Amino acid sequence: MSVDKEFLASLPTLPGVYRMVDAAGAVLYVGKAKDLRKRVGSYFLKTDQSPRIRLMLKSVDHIDTTVTRTEAEALLLENNLIKGLKPRFNILFRDDKSYPYLLLTGHGYPRLAYFRGAPKKRDQAFGPYPNSYAVRESIQLLQKVFQLRTCEDTVFGNRSRPCLLHQIKRCSAPCVSLVSAETYARDVAEAMLLLKGEATALTEEITAQMNAAAENLDFETAAYLRDRLRMLATVREKQFVDTTGSEADADVVAVAEVGGVIAVNLTMIRGGRHLGDRSFFPQHGEGAALGEALEAFVAQHYLDHPIPARILVSEAIDSAALQTLLSEQAGKKVTLQHRVTGERRVWIAMAQANARLSAERRSADRANQSQRLAALRDTLELPTLNRIECFDISHTMGEATIASCVVYEGDDLKKSDYRRYNIEGITPGDDYAAMHAALIKRFHRTVEENGVLPDLLLIDGGKGQVAMAVEALAELGIDDVLLLGVAKGESRKPGLETLIFADGRELKLARDHPGFHLIQQVRDEAHRFAITGHRAKRGKARVQSTLEDIAGIGPKRRKQLLEHFGGLQGVRNAGVDALASVNGISRELAEIIYNALH
């Protein structure tokens, strides 16, 4: 785009958002500005632009602008547009998952649970945690120290003897009254102290209890409390960092770059406990400055996730507008800090070291994947190999048939392009017909709309499935995609697969062939994606059919029963009185349900 001085002069000196648009109308880049005229004009005055920006400017046809009241409002609009439009030259962080929490339920004997979503009012949630592993690790540690139950309420209410967790000293067995309500409530209260970061107060409390027991010559209790103190010390050593006052809750965001790979590491500290780390890798981040990547992450990530009162960052960023926006989003004052001392400086160094390790691993993986892709391309004698699609079929004796399609593009699996297909209208258990139907579903619209076709199409199966795939592609007029079946062979052992071409030719690659490893990776991912979809569909169908086949039970009552008892097994375990206690279930209907399930 050449410089249009009249256009630049017409821009207001107000905050707002600008969009770089190409000749086809596609938005290439979205940015925000405190002063639109200055910011947009800077693109045409600077001579030291990054290669990424120079490439973008060559494609820009025109620039659209939107004026906002404040810079913070511009920042919010910018990031909403980036998430919605996904412009090619913006740094984009994808993070669609909600964060998990550790839950203490509001039951008379509260249980520890892993949870995502909005907790019920009577439950207490602690977190968020960066990943499910961190929650489960915390639950295991709390079980060791406080022996709180983790079983579902339906299981708890129907036990007649302690489970294995009691035998290995991970649960005090309140289900069969091996612990008093008062003692269990005290254990819950102490666990909550630990989760809230009051570990010092908890240690002092248990120490006082131990000393009191020893003075009363209750040496058994004193020894038990001594062991609890030791386990608590282990937990503190493993999860706690040195914190004081309001600094006990913070996120630490650090960025690093290795071999062209940028990684952002998010470290979560809640109640003085280091809950864990999570790494993020931006799309379109090539050539971006570290501060630019970090600012993009903070702005995009916290639009959809809980915001702590303090965020420590490893790079200096333009934090004024960002701080205002985050404070408005959180409904409280949020502080962004870069230049810090003492323990907070140590936290940033720790997060930065983790970011560097993540970038190093991703860089090594990328090099390895590039080698695999090149080896497979050369072996199959393909001019280009950028996109691979793989299909798999999953069912149980013909029930709940699901076809999966996974995509490998560039040097990684492209999960946004994954698809599952419900296969109906075929003979149950007919894998050949299922494969034919799946391919027709996948490529019918692609052909009509002139969409993207893969360079290589993998079919998890032998000659029969390959023949069906050939037939389906022929029906659609597709003849420029290399088709390859991946047959497991008689022994079905990994590493002994045979590759089958569309014309029936067979190819066996060495077990250590890099290209063969790539095929296995994509095939295994297709299998995983198919089987998880199949299990979900099968489980849903079985629950629906089991309850809805009972006279008087429709979708609404089925939902009430499942929510009340925590699942179908809980409904099965419930007696007539328990069933009749559910809203909308009369005693007569409860007896019908009980008899139908037994």
Swiss-Prot record:
InterPro entries: GIY-YIG_endonuc, GIY-YIG_endonuc_sf, GIY-YIG_UvrC_Cho, Hlx-hairpin-Hlx_DNA-bd_motif, RuvA_2-like, UVR_dom, UVR_dom_sf, UvrABC_protein_C
Main subcellular localisation: cytoplasm
GO biological process, one term: SOS response
Compartmental location: Cytoplasm
Keyword tags: Cytoplasm, DNA damage, DNA excision, DNA repair, Excision nuclease, SOS response
Family according to the record: Belongs to the UvrC family.
Record-given protein name: UvrABC system protein C
Organism in which the protein naturally occurs: Thiobacillus denitrificans (strain ATCC 25259 / T1)
